[in-house]
Amino acid sequence: MNIRRALFLSFALLAGVTGVAQQRLPSYPGVREGQAARQALASSVSLARTSGWWQDNFTFIHPVGNETFAFDARTGQRTALTARPTRPAAGGGGRQPGRGRQFTTLASPDGSARADYKDGNLSLTENGRTTALSQDGDEARGIKYGSASWVYGEELAQNEAFGFSPNSRYVWFYRFDESRVPIYYLTLNQRDPQSTLATERYPKPGQPNPEVELYIFDRQTRQTTRMQVRPGAFDEGVGHYIFRIGWLADGRLYFRRADRRQQVLELCASDPTTGITKVLQRETNPEGWVDGDFPMFPVGNDRLLSITERNGFANWAWVGMDGTVTPLTSHQAEVRRPVHFDDQNQVLFYMALDGKRHGAQLWRVGYNGQGAARLTDPELAHQVMPSPDGQFFVVTSQSDTVPPLVRIIDRNGQVKATVAESNVESISRAGYRRTEALTFTSADGRTELNARLHYPVNFDPSKKYPMILPVYGGPLGAFQTSWNPSFELPDSYCDYGFFVLEVENRGPSGRGVAFKNAMYRHMGRAEIDDMAKGVEMARTKPGVDGNRVGIIGTSYGGYTSIMAILRYPDHFHAAVSNSNVSDWRNYDTTYTERYMDLLERNVEGYDAGRAATYAANLKGALMIYYGTADD
């Protein structure tokens, strides 16, 4: 079912109507007027954006409808083109394995060999001859070479379980022993006359995890060597998880390893011929978890650009091949992806969330840590597209209240050209108010959080309107952000007479280690408490009916929705919960234990995060739904 449709059906009671059917929607009071207002809004309001590209180091191509313009970044001159140039092919992307899976066949870089996984074993084909790299693999027994456990693909983004070295000499591969991991049964094809049964080794909190080893086969010596992936036993210390595998410029295999609690993360390098392993970087967080999915970037042959959180925020650091770690930035805010590496001038351009309301800013800093400078206006948030040589940048700038503006700047932050401007003057003529930027204090009384309030169409402050919160609320991956200051047109729920409230909560990434740690061992507490505080703030706004508040979400957002209506029944009066995890004992180990700690160490926290604990509190309307093959 379409989520937005489901929300309207469930929340119809908030607006005072019942017996909803989709085909009767236009007959509801105010719906036709709202749809007409949306059409007027779409036809009269434009937000500046660009789907353009850099044709060369100084020419930016900007398509607008059937027209195309070229901007010369050196002079700022705009030229109308009679024909649209061919867009250069984009790098990256490509095929991906299925969710939670890994590739089953891979060719060597030089094309001289191919590795294949089948039925628990890995083989290598060279010059038409096939060599078995493993022989005792057996999927039925839970032994696999060249294929990973499901949690590795799903929770650690490991989409390769074997691979070649850049020079094609070595083949690395996993060995997994899942024999102690319980089997999970999943019924599929339930809409067909005959359903099917799928099985998966699926570890839940408190259960054994898959045991992992890492091997390298040398195509020259025909020898297989086991890498030293851990200093002790599998269940003791680091090396419980082995992931993010690749090759360094000096020929060593690198990987990340973590303990089961994921409070220690080490970047390691192994000699492919001896298996001897050296730790290059170690990060710890005894009060929470260490994110293991931050990318690394090789710079030259002797160092990597990596993330460290040692000052409480994600910052850049140089990691040497000898294991020395040298901080490069020291923001009291989190950095985001590099924008451009200028190796010739030894300058890094990157983004950092140090603007107003944690908006992303473009920064530059020398490779030696000197000359750090912000190049964008901290009152706004920015998205950046560098020219191929990094001399110019297309910057889209906006805030919660300032509509987008697209400009070209140089490497000193000087504006060279305006590419596109927004036209939002017609918002009020279409019957809408601009979205309002708000702040409120977190439930612990120590943290300022952000919010946005969307007003219903044709808003009359003398009337009362129901309010909806679309939510997620849970932890986020590397370089994702808990709040993004952006200018938003009124939400489509507003067309049907709803306020829409977006709220920030503690727990996700983007605002430092302490902000994340607020969720540790107690999912379902801090984020729900903060959303309730956001509702309390919004209830003071004219027109908000504090007795008709709904909440909707999917996945972790579904969990947030069900916990909100159960823990705060006087704040939330209807909830739509799609694909929620209602009890963390039933989710997988790798995700759950990262944020909730081990079950035996935190039974109280698991109980407190279980929806059924609060079932007796339900007062309002709760809708729970799943797909027919939810994993």
Regions found by a protein language model. Name each.
Residues V17-A21:
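Sec/Tat signal peptide C-region and signal peptidase I cleavage site
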Residues P182-I183, I242, A258, Q383-D631:
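Serine-hydrolase catalytic core recognition
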Residues Q55-N57, G111, S168, A249-R252, ...:
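Conserved loop/turn motif of beta-propeller repeat scaffolds
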Residues F8-G16:
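Bacterial N-terminal signal peptides
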